[in-house]
Amino acid sequence: MRRLTRAVLAVALSIPAGAVGQAAERLSGDATRKVFEGNTVSGRYSGNNLPFSEFHHPDGRASGHNRNVANTDACWITTADAVCYYYGPTETRRTYCFTVELSGRLYVLRSRPSGRINGVATIEPGDPHGFSAGAAQWTCDGLISRAPGRSRLARR
């Protein structure tokens, strides 16, 4: 099954950006939040084909891994038209935002503002890999604290 998934992702990543854009439905930030929240987003990055898999906690944390490196402070939030992730303490924080397009069962993540495909993912219901059970605990501040209706800090 993993070989099939890798083959599907490899084909999806090889499609020219214009072709994917025409066949895909761009999701609003609210639609993206509804799909991602409480679920695991798993896929591969374009360019290097390295994996990512993150469980999106309702409180703004993203536990799991990027490029096989465990998340220790990852947070996520949606804007009007994108999903944004931030990593690290305030003084050295790295922020990445992506528009999300649905093409069949695949979610195409495009870097903002360039529009380049950053990765292709699928949604796994819930937390099938148990990322939240073994994750270190952290709080999400900054972007998440200023989001409408999302002022609650991650706790546990």
Give names to the regions the model predicted:
Residues 1-8:
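Bacterial N-terminal signal peptides that target proteins for export
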Residues 8-16:
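Bacterial N-terminal signal peptides
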Residues 18-73, 85-156:
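Lipid interaction determinants
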